Amino acid sequence: PTLVANYIPAGIEVMLQSENGLLGMGEFPDEETIDADMINAGKQTVTAQTGAAIFDSAQSFAMIRGGHVDLTVLGAFEVDVAGNIASWMIPGKMVKGMGGAMDLVAGARNIIVVMTHASKNGESKLLPQCTLPLTGVGCIRRVLTDLALLEIVDGAFVLREVAPGVSPDEVIRKTAGRLIVADDVREMRFS
């Protein structure tokens, strides 16, 4: 999700917010424009767009909790066919924690999950029911993985697009939750 700013097509105006208090976050800097004091919530250096605003995290979360965020892009450990998301804890393992994810799933109008389709050991992360503690309940409608773009509709993942070189059959094999292949599945375009 932190890479989103690098992939916004030219001519499209988007105002990205970082939870730590930057509205108007730009893409990752090159060596000439790097500023070690300009970071996102993940502590990665970023740039600021013209007209950006910098404020404290309390103000940032007031915007998020107040419903002033149109869209959020989150990573996840698991998503299920009911639109539930687990993104903050794996029992018995050290992970960074939830950060602002619970605020974002409750306060943003739309949520897109961006994640790998399978875990490091090859197990599907798209499940009939999440097995990990939930971050949000019934709030996810769209999931983008390294294999596919899926929507969650009526208790099923609906396959809408496949990544270049990926077949619908591969997505079927690697999805544990109920999956419906749309009649008009197409290949993702990156231009």
Language-model segments: residues:
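Conserved phosphate- and dinucleotide-binding cores of soluble alpha/beta proteins
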Residues: 24-191
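N-terminal low-complexity or amphipathic/hydrophobic leaders
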Residues: 1-19, 23
